[in-house]
Amino acid sequence: NIKKTTIYIKPDIKDYTVVSFDKGKEIIVKGEEATFAVYEQLKALTSETQRYQKPKMKVSSDSVFVTDIKVNELKNFTSAYVKGKLRFKPVTIITYDKLQSGINTINGTQNFNAINYALEPDGYGETLVLNLKENETKTLLKLGLHYDGLYKSAVLANISQKNLFFKNDNASLDLIIGDNLRYNLDYYVDNGFNISFGFKSTFAQFNRNVANSIQPGGIVGGDISLINIDFKDWTNQAYFQSVFVQKFLIGAGLEYKHLQIVPITIAKNSPDIDNSNYFSVFGYLKYDAFDNKYFPTKGWTFTGDIHSYLMSSNQTKTFNPFTILKADFAVAFKVIPKLVFKFQTDAGVSIGEKSVPFFDFVLGGYGFAPVNNFKPFYGYDFLSIGGDSYIKTAGTLDYEFYKKNHFNFSANFANIGDKIFSSLDWFSLPKYSGYAVGYGLETILGPIEVKYSWSPEDSKGFAWFSIGYVF
């Protein structure tokens, strides 16, 4: 009873909750301030002859044993969906940081208006009790802008619909209007740690001048150094995936792709470079712990992918079944406050008989949405160098000199060509290198980036602009 209390100390902690673990120092300061306010009253209670001896502090654990996870009944989502967003299962020891990260992930889905949770002792550990209030909004419309040197200017209209057919599902359509009409259609049923499934359909196109020598023997015959092409890619995937060891996304699926590459600068009635259908199976393993996709300050990512092309309508009469393996790893960390170093390495190889070159790895350019095996590379223009195998390493120093304003310096090195892993040549000094200095600004419309890039192998430099989220 407060009225019967001789000295009542009440810190001002109304801005904190029972899970404000990252605000511990601030909460302690609030307690000290409230205590010093009644210091004289406390001093009057002490004895000069028998001073209080503070016992040794017992450090409590920064982790908790979660024995069970209980979720209130939901109309449009299952408990498996919610537990999957937490990224940990019952009967698991987790840190409070991981608990907070899981709650933040649930909040980030924007599927719930209110999230109340508590840890309740159950004799063996703690039961995590979640009480969620669903967001009644199911249809969302979003708009976006983007510009890069490959797809040029684009306006995005995205419409998404939750619970279109089932609980936990989400359908999303990106209609991209601009210099190159494109779309992305995605339907996904998210069952958390259980097997989830989905369908993707994408259409991408662009027009570009490409060096005829980008592949051995040239893209077309004759004494032609540069070709203007229309590139069109229509890809459809059906896949399933799950969460592996509570961290990695692991999945597999089937793919149908139609690829059309038309030469514009050749004779009017010249045949298409390719106009074929391709059927393949694929598998992947993914992990992403970056705190920011475009300007990460901590975390790491990994992607491993295997793609086996089994059949084709074979318009070029040169198709043979083949498999592409590729992997990408990146890590970011702070060197000093405001200065971040990001290291990235990726590699790929084609296995099997000599086949069509249209799925070779192609390096060059920056800031574009990936399609097939086109990869960014500082120092070279878009789609400049290619081969059926490659290895690349890159490093970036990023300095945030003012809030959301970044200055960065990047360097990348690569070996690329046909069958480079059949000998130790890939382990030699890099054949290709490039550097870039840039400025980046984080805005509500996405990042705005300006980069100037050059290579010691070429006297020509490139200025690249990327505006808005990449799509």
Show which residues each predicted segment covers.
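Outer-membrane beta-barrel transmembrane domain signature
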Residues: 271, 279, 333-340, 356, ...
